[in-house]
């Protein structure tokens, strides 16, 4: 794919996804705005800030916008993530965020590619493993147990968040587990973003003994098929360094990077 194609995909991402808001919203989640920023509140893991662009704000005006977010979430006593992208302007935004108390976490690469070729591939899993779509809280809790084993961190908010999304609009998200017997060995979900050509892929954590056996790839192709059934034409993933090479081999293209900047009161 040419640089021009990658730029076209990035433009589609900027205009269709970056400021998109779930409709209907999950229970307890609200949205408001501060200038160019879209603020999501009531999420199970804190607030979230996104935007298509910053309307050309620089210098003191930009510092003022950042300071208002710090004060807003300090008053609420909750953390907030500012989702920064590598092509965002102005270029000094990361240092301004750090100066205001935001801390960068691990960067990821935004990759995008066409649904059709992936949807045409058969999901192939190792013998003894099956893929299954799930909606129950019991299954979501099993996903959390797998995630906590992988990351050695509390992931309980994940089950609550997914449960609320499914309850708000079961047609907007599908959660898929890879199981070996009674054990969840990997899981991922796909969101069908309304009013766009995009489906977005999330999750993908896999227990160590089951890695490098094609399960992650199978989950990607399975969810691509679900996206094709819903007339989505593009897949988007915030890819870790581990998953990015797999996704690139499957035809997805890096278009930018993204880094969570987190403020914690």
Q: Which role fits each region the language model picked out?
A:
Residues 1-19, 60, 108-110, 115-165, ...:
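Short amphipathic alpha-helix that is part of the acyltransferase structural core
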Residues 1-72, 89:
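N-terminal charged segments
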Residues 30-36, 92-103, 172-188:
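Conserved beta-hairpin
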Residues 40-52, 192-201, 211:
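A conserved beta-turn-beta hairpin within the catalytic core of GNAT-like acetyltransferases
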Residues 61-138, 237, 259-263:
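Acyl-donor-binding surface of acyltransferase catalytic domains
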Residues 62-70, 202-208, 212-229, 239, ...:
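Conserved acetyl-CoA-binding loop-helix of GNAT-fold acetyltransferases
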Residues 155-209:
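A conserved beta-strand-loop-helix scaffold within acyl/acetyltransferase catalytic domains
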């Amino acid at each position: 794919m040419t640089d021009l194609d990658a730029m076209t995909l990035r433009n589609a991402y900027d205009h269709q996804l970056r400021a998109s808001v779930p409709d209907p919203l999950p229970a307890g989640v609200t949205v408001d705005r501060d200038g160019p920023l879209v603020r999501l509140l009531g999420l199970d893991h804190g607030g979230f800030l996104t935007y298509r662009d910053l309307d050309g704000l620089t210098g003191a005006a930009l510092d003022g916008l950042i300071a208002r977010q710090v004060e807003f979430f300090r008053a609420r006593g909750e953390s907030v993530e500012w989702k920064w992208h590598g092509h965002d302007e102005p270029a000094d935004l990361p240092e301004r965020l750090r100066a205001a108390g935001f801390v960068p976490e691990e960067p990821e690469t935004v990759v995008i590619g066409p649904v059709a070729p992936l949807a045409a591939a058969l999901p192939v899993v190792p013998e003894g493993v099956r893929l299954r779509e799930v909606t129950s809280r019991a299954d979501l809790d099993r996903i959390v147990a797998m995630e906590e084993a992988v990351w050695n961190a509390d992931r309980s908010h994940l089950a609550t968040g997914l449960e609320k999304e499914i309850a708000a609009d079961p047609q907007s998200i599908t959660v898929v587990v890879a199981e070996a017997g009674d054990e969840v060995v990997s899981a991922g979900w796909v969101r069908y973003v309304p009013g766009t050509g995009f489906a977005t892929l999330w999750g993908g954590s896999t227990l160590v003994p089951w890695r490098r056996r094609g399960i992650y790839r199978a989950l990607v192709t399975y969810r691509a098929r679900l996206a094709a059934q819903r007339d989505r034409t593009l897949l988007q993933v915030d890819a870790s360094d581990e998953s990015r090479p797999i996704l690139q081999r499957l035809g997805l293209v890096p278009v930018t990077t993204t880094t969570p900047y987190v403020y914690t009161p």
